[in-house]
Amino acid sequence: MKPFLNDSWWAVMKSEFEQPYYQELREWMKEEYRTQTVFPKPDDVYRALHLTSYEEVKVVILGQDPYHGPGQAHGLSFSVQPGVKHPPSLRNIFQELKDDLGCPVPNHGSLVSWAEQGVLLLNTVLTVRKGEANSHKGKGWERVTDRVIDALNERDQPVVFVLWGRHAQNKKERIDQNKHYIIESPHPSPFSARNGFFGSRPFSKVNAYLKQMGTEEINWCIQDIE
């Protein structure tokens, strides 16, 4: 079964999907979906790699694992489906976006418009059990998403990596900083946002770098849904 992702990513990831560890992960995941409530739904697991093709990635915003509440996760880091209340981290992201670029806080929490402009919203672990944060940690997803990061690092075209919090910053060693650009700050979670996430202006920093590279900037402001 081919994972539901963009053809350009399929070409990049195909050999990874043939590895024995991935076959084990797949079998384990089948059993998890059969016996547990798991988020996101199977078709959305690779949504980040479906909406943003390999060649078009300009920015990576690295998350940890999906939201574990009903109806929240849909395969994009920090993003929630329309109609779902903004989780605390996303609320803080929107607050910083407003302070940084003056973007009004949207009436929904879907970041699909970012993904469609080349922002890869990647969690390092792609699934989670309902109500159990980090429940799928250490099962093999980290190897999959490390390969995604490595593939982007191999590209000649520069990528901006946005690393919020220690978990994301642990991936720094995989990134060639002579070629790519890293923006880091504390995590937007309520536990750490006041320790340096607020006021860090990541969105304008990303755009300044893209402009310097001669690349089209991201329109970070998100339209309300009627």
Swiss-Prot record:
It is found in: Cytoplasm. The active site is at 65 (proton acceptor). One of its GO terms (molecular function) is uracil DNA N-glycosylase activity. PROSITE patterns: U_DNA_GLYCOSYLASE. Keywords: Cytoplasm, DNA damage, DNA repair, Hydrolase. Pfam families: UDG (PF03167). The keyword Cell inner membrane does not apply. It catalyses: Hydrolyzes single-stranded DNA or mismatched double-stranded DNA and polynucleotides, releasing free uracil. One of its GO terms (biological process) is base-excision repair, AP site formation via deaminated base removal. Its main location: cytoplasm. Its EC number is 3.2.2.27. InterPro entries: UDG_fam1, Ura-DNA_Glyclase_AS, Uracil-DNA_glycosylase-like, Uracil-DNA_glycosylase-like_sf. It is an enzyme of class 3 (hydrolase). GO terms for cellular component: cytoplasm. It comes from the Bacteria. Excises uracil residues from the DNA which can arise as a result of misincorporation of dUMP residues by DNA polymerase or due to deamination of cytosine. Belongs to the uracil-DNA glycosylase (UDG) superfamily. UNG family. HAMAP family: UDG. This is Uracil-DNA glycosylase. It comes from Bacillus pumilus (strain SAFR-032).
